[in-house]
Amino acid sequence: AAESAAESAAESVTAATQGGKVGVCIYKFDDAFMTTYRNALQEILEGKGYEVTIVDGNNDQAKQNEQINTFITQGVDALIINPVMTSAADQIISTVKGADVPTVLINREPTADQMSAYDKLVYVGCDAAQSGTFQGELILDTENKGDINGDGKVSYIMIQGDPENIDAQLRTEYSVKALTDAGVEVEQLDLQRGDWDRNKGQEICQNDLA
């Protein structure tokens, strides 16, 4: 999924500018999915002759804003931005529009109104609803369909990367919907924010299972 998404992002860049320098802002490097994504992106773009610089936002939106401004000052021909915070989309879009830099937003989808604010802006992401459905189907494919204790329902802990993120919302909704559509009774025991952090997710699970 990461490789195909990276290829789509690269295609969006080539549609906007032929050659030149591309600045890539990743919300944080310490994320397995985004590591695969950025490595694939760099390989694809450099293979097409682009000069690529990728920076780590360290999960800090203020730092990422500075990185975007630095890239603009350096005169990049295009930007690829994986926002730290979904709520920062307005500011990011205003900045790149003011600089007239073609920009690809990845992995955290803005609203339709935000996307329409700048004609050189595109979004590339996975089908989050489909991803959520696949997650639910994985549970349905287990021997007991997720009903481990045999009480006739699937009791679950839901860990969301970021509740403000549209993709996270859709994955949450459709993973559960896949179960209920199959006639499975469900019970949510806990809903926590995990910030796409494996250690935090493990800690939440350990606390809930204690």
Which ranges hold each PLM region?
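A residue-level marker of the well-folded mature domains of exported/periplasmic proteins
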Residues: 1-210
